[in-house]
């Protein structure tokens, strides 16, 4: 087993958002969490990413309990959070910069720019890209983190149908 969530619960301002959520995700599985706006999808991802603390419940990766932020997870929030003063290649390679392996990160990123529909935009700035291209850059940045588990919040929200199907 790769990921296990047990009895996850959280409420905000006396409103129960998640209550006793249990699930498992096996290695190699892709899981989509669907539901109406406000039902707790983003909240669950924020808890898994270590950005929010649940009231109770546990998270396990390979049977080891995980608390807070963990290198097991790479999180892509709904907003792309691209740094406006950095080029797309520099934004995509932030993980490499943090971990002092920028040249390796750039090599990996450049190989994926075409796959993500970003070829030719390596030196562009975020404000020069469409919303869909910004979203793809954020997705690529997350994919390059070398995490075991990708947590993607609305990864295809700003993409047109053709690009969504290609991804």
Predicted regions and their residues:
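The feature captures the beta-strand-to-loop junction immediately N-terminal to the Walker
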Residues: 34-36
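Helix-to-loop junction immediately C-terminal to a conserved catalytic motif
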Residues: 49
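Conserved ABC transporter NBD signature motif
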Residues: 57-69
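Conserved ABC ATPase "signature" region
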Residues: 103-121
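Conserved ABC ATPase signature
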Residues: 125-129, 133
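A short, proline-enriched helix->beta-strand linker immediately N-terminal to the Walker B motif
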Residues: 144-148
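Catalytic Walker B motif of ABC-type/P-loop ATPase nucleotide-binding domains
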Residues: 150-153
């Amino acid at each position: 087993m790769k990921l296990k969530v047990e009895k996850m619960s959280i409420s905000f301002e006396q409103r129960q958002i998640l209550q006793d959520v249990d699930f498992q995700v096996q290695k190699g599985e892709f899981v989509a969490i669907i539901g109406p706006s406000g039902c707790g999808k983003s909240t669950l991802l924020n808890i898994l990413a270590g950005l929010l603390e649940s009231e109770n419940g546990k998270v396990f990766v390979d049977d080891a309990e995980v608390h807070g932020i963990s290198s097991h997870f790479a999180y892509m929030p709904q907003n792309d959070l691209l740094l406006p003063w950095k080029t797309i290649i520099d934004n995509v390679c932030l993980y490499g910069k943090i971990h002092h392996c920028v040249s390796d990160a750039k090599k990996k990123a450049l190989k994926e720019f075409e796959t993500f529909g970003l070829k030719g935009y390596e030196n562009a700035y975020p404000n020069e890209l469409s919303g869909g291209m910004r979203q793809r850059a954020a997705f690529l940045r997350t994919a390059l983190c070398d995490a075991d588990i990708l947590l993607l919040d609305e990864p295809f929200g700003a993409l047109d149908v053709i690009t969504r199907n290609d991804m």
